[in-house]
Amino acid sequence: MELEVRRVRQAFLSGRSRPLRFRLQQLEALRRMVQEREKDILAAIAADLCKSEFNVYSQEVITVLGEIDFMLENLPEWVTAKPVKKNVLTMLDEAYIQPQPLGVVLIIGAWNYPFVLTIQPLIGAIAAGNAVIIKPSELSENTAKMLAKLLPQYLDQDLYIVINGGVEETTELLKQRFDHIFYTGNTAVGKIVMEAAAKHLTPVTLELGGKSPCYIDKDCDLDIVCRRITWGKYMNCGQTCIAPDYILCEASLQNQIVWKIKETVKEFYGENIKESPDYERIINLRHFKRILSLLEGQKIAFGGETDEATRYIAPTVLTDVDPKTKVMQEEIFGPILPIVPVKNVDEAINFINEREKPLALYVFSHNHKLIKRMIDETSSGGVTGNDVIMHFMLNSFPFGGVGSSGMGAYHGKHSFDTFSHQRPCLLKSLKREGANKLRYPPNSQSKVDWGKFFLLKRFNKEKLGLLLLTFLGIVAAVLVKAEYY
């Protein structure tokens, strides 16, 4: 691992990844890979998660293509130096911020959306001019092998490499020094990544998860609400980091919500859900058994059918869920939807705030003041009102968590910023030295007054006239001296 990282760092130090033209070429090559090898990509993801080609394309491929196009369109503007506002002391100088690549980036991908959650941060890292080591999740084995095969055929083989393996390989990778680590996964591993990064003072972006609440107000159209929740919850068999994890609603709404979700599930997946090409499977047997354990002691309103041989768990809704039970203590990451009755919106807000900050918050109501109130009085990585998941689709938004749901953000310009150092640059002249006398010893009260005037905009009114006359005299002297030389 050490040799691989050293090789990538040497490639970065060559400066090859920095020019705008090179970055654009690599992004175009990545787009070409997605377009030319679409069938290989679809097949690999389908094999890992039993996804239909339509779901793979709509949930992963199209997002990657959109992100690349967005970068290609905007990158020439983003890489340019940006002038900044100057103060009196620097008014004759050149002051700007220059985005600069961080260096060698490690991207540790996720298994639930193994293509988009690995390639999307890669797009940002390339756009920012970095070298990258990509570590796909070993749980999505077919996608990991596909990335290791295809990426070297299209991208610079020295600057961008794929390393496959399990816990042992990842642990060894984390011992190496990187300039940024980008991790997508669960909170427990996120802490391990952050601890390893701290040994080298390496900054991290942690895209984690959590229990994303969904509050349903009594003042809304339940038919529409339940269709949108059903789509977001059971997409990818519930294995989505921003899927609605549980519902908060008044007890009087519970039976209606159950019935409407049940009818929507039939509409989406048919009478025999197990045979639907649009309904995926749990990634492996370990996660299958973990999810089943969450059903113990729960009141199943509908669903609950399972098949261990195919890792099938039917869309399931639980009612009257006790907040102290296991299903409410950890992120579900599966097709189980608990309903927790609350008395009103006040209790819902308190319920959310008493727990770890979620990756997403969903609020359904015709009353936009209520939605705004929940936004103002809670904290989460992102919010969507009257829908679910959709804030992920807007690449002008930063996507990321807060607290235990993560740190840092990406997508669009936010990806470029995450993988860039905003370097402040001040260029002064070696002339006009007379204007610098105020900052050189010996010090005096008049110099303190000048400092207040220039830097703090605080001054003694009685001395204002004298200060202004002195300032004008210095400026005149500087100009005369500059003209003389």
From Swiss-Prot:
The active site is at E207, C241. Its EC number is 1.2.1.3, 1.2.1.94. The chain crosses the membrane at residues 464-484. Keywords: Endoplasmic reticulum, Fatty acid metabolism, Lipid metabolism, Membrane, Microsome, NAD, Oxidoreductase, Phosphoprotein, Transmembrane, Transmembrane helix. A motif (Prevents secretion from ER) lies at residues 481-484. The keyword Oxidoreductase applies. GO terms for cellular component: endoplasmic reticulum membrane. It is a single-pass membrane protein. Its main location: membrane. The lineage of its organism: Eukaryota, Metazoa, Chordata, Craniata, Vertebrata. NAD(+) binds at G185, N186, T187, A188, V189, G190. PANTHER family: ALDEHYDE DEHYDROGENASE (PTHR43570), ALDEHYDE DEHYDROGENASE FAMILY 3 MEMBER A2 (PTHR43570:SF9). The gene is ALDH3A2. This is Aldehyde dehydrogenase family 3 member A2. InterPro entries: Ald_DH/histidinol_DH, Ald_DH_C, Ald_DH_CS_CYS, Ald_DH_CS_GLU, Ald_DH_N, Aldehyde_DH_dom, Aldehyde_DH_NAD(P). One of its GO terms (molecular function) is medium-chain fatty aldehyde dehydrogenase (NAD+) activity. Belongs to the aldehyde dehydrogenase family. The modification Phosphoserine is found at S293. Residues 1-463 are cytoplasmic. It is found in: Microsome membrane; Endoplasmic reticulum membrane. It comes from Pongo abelii (Sumatran orangutan). Catalyzes the oxidation of medium and long-chain aliphatic aldehydes to fatty acids. Active on a variety of saturated and unsaturated aliphatic aldehydes between 6 and 24 carbons in length. Responsible for conversion of the sphingosine 1-phosphate (S1P) degradation product hexadecenal to hexadecenoic acid. One of its GO terms (biological process) is hexadecanal metabolic process. Homodimer. It comes from the Eukaryota. It catalyses: an aldehyde + NAD(+) + H2O = a carboxylate + NADH + 2 H(+); a fatty aldehyde + NAD(+) + H2O = a fatty acid + NADH + 2 H(+); (2E)-hexadecenal + NAD(+) + H2O = (E)-hexadec-2-enoate + NADH + 2 H(+); hexadecanoate + NADH + 2 H(+) = hexadecanal + NAD(+) + H2O.
